[in-house]
Every structure is written in C-alpha cells, then in structure tokens.
Amino acid sequence: MASLSSKSALVSRLLQVKKESGKTYTEIAKLTGLTNAYVAQLFRRQAHLKPETASALKAAVPALSDDLLAAMQEIPMRSFDPTVVQDPTIYRLHEATVHYGESIKDIINEEFGDGIMSAIGYYCSVEKVKGKEGEDRVVIIMNGKFLPHVEQVN
C-alpha cells in the first residue's frame, strides 16, 4: 500500500498533467463517458481507473504517462486530509449535509424503508445552471443505491 506522502506526490503529478492539458473535469468527462465528479476522483486518487477506461482517459489527456495510468489503475487508499474540511466550499457541503441530514434520512426512510443510500455503486455529478434571477447556481446530483438494513437471524 502506498504511503500518504507518496499518494500526495502522485496526486500533485496528476493534477499538474490535468492543468497542462487545459481541460476541465467536465470536458474530460465528456470525452471519456464518465461523470465530472468521477474524473475528479480519479485525478485525486479517490477512485480506481478501470483498465477498459484507461485508453479513453489517455486520449482525453494525452500527457498521462503509462506510469501514471498504471498508478491510477491501482486500488486507491480512499482517505482525506482532515484539514480539507477547513476549505470554505467543503465546509459548506459538510454544513449542508449536517443541516439537511436528518430530514433527508427521514425522507429516504419514508420512501424506501429502513436503510441507507450507498456510496458504492454511486454516481455524482456537478452542474452549473442559471437561477430564477439569472444567478449562477450549483447543482450536485448524488445518486446512490438504496441498501435496506437486514434483520440478523441465526
């Protein structure tokens, strides 16, 4: 397993290659058939690049070396630096989850029963839309499989 410092170095290299490509996550997503959030997860080593997707990613970002593509295909250590929560955007996402969390849970339970929304088999995307007054608005779509809690019997 790679150390967190080597993960950090790899992520820095991947983000530099992405920056040099001049492409956004959304542009890369359109070229690869992935969501923009998943592409960002790949470059941040929070997701595993499937071998069958590697060629599309290489075509979208030609400067990705074979070594970088191979590293992206290793199963990642899905972790985060605890100080990342101090970033205002991430903090506001956390704040929204805390503020709406119990209400969202209640609605999930009413609509589906006793269970959770999985982050496995999960799709996420971020979209930019115009609001009613012409202002830019952020739409985050979180699409997770419902997993019912099961009764544990012998």
Curated annotation (Swiss-Prot):
Keywords: Lyase. It comes from the Eukaryota. InterPro entries: Cyanase, Cyanate_lyase_C, Cyanate_lyase_C_sf, Lambda_DNA-bd_dom_sf. It catalyses: cyanate + hydrogencarbonate + 3 H(+) = NH4(+) + 2 CO2. Its EC number is 4.2.1.104. One of its GO terms (molecular function) is DNA binding. It is an enzyme of class 4 (lyase). The keyword Chaperone does not apply. Belongs to the cyanase family. Catalyzes the reaction of cyanate with bicarbonate to produce ammonia and carbon dioxide. This is Cyanate hydratase. It comes from Physcomitrium patens. The gene is CYN.
